[in-house]
């Protein structure tokens, strides 16, 4: 399974891309595959404050409803309305068009997993 090298990861299966103080967040291909057909996503609202490791929304598939966790601290500055309107994007392109929300970082995240660490985690769960 694809684990892009330029991203950070969490144990809850979110990915983070940081560019000039803005973190783009999504769920990993591993999580998308485990969920199956994603039918609904409720990301945090623009302007809300999110805290690393805390629930900030939910994602629903035919199989289950799962909490969406923020991997970073900060203020939500954008939500991917295309993924809200068409949740299948999350499963079909989780690292591209299926991103979920963007956060203006309060501080650099300290405990993200490297791609290698995340691969080891998923091999243990897979």
Swiss-Prot record:
Instruction: Give the co-factor note.
Output: Binds 1 lipoyl cofactor covalently.
**Gene3D superfamilies according to UniProt:** 2.40.50.100
- Keywords recorded for this protein, A-Z: Lipoyl
- Domain (Lipoyl-binding) ranges: 22-104
CDD domains given in the database record: GCS_H
| Residue intervals passing through the bilayer | none
Q: Does the keyword Transferase apply?
A: no
> Any idea which residues bear N6-lipoyllysine here?
63
Protein name per Swiss-Prot or TrEMBL: Glycine cleavage system H protein
Organism whose genome encodes this protein: Thermobifida fusca (strain YX)
